[in-house]
Amino acid sequence: IKDKLLKAMNENDGFLQEIDFKKYKINSGAPLVSSYRNNLVFTAGPPSGGGVVLLTSLNILSAYDLSKYGSNSTATYHLIAEALRRGHNNRSHHIGDPSFYDIPINDLLSKERTKEFIKSISFDKATPSSKVRPLRITNESRDTTHYSIVDKDGNAVSNTY
């Protein structure tokens, strides 16, 4: 895989070199774990932000009996959109590389935060993203690169920088 990446970099004026692969150290962390309707949900923790979006959204949705609204109803889609909006708020304002940032993961996924989010959802209208309150204000760089590779033997690597 490394040789193919380096070949592609060389052919396309890329910036990765052999030394970058030699210096690279793999970081792995514990997964985030939560429950949703009596099912355990395991997902990637920071620096990946998707897990926080997923668990925040599921924590919010667990407060609603979605079957009451029907699987294809406006109310169900509205709740899913509102939950995802709040999940993305948690990700956008608070997730980064834990090697460099203090990430308040327990606060982000807490019952108290979930209750605040649930109280802020209206069935009458969509919440403007600007009105979803971050836990605290942080500045996020706009420079992120991510790639995941799986080879024919099932070996996998995921990299975000």
Regions found by a protein language model. Give the residues of each.
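Composition- and surface-driven signal marking solvent-exposed, interaction-prone regions
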Residues: 7, 20-22, 56, 70-73, ...
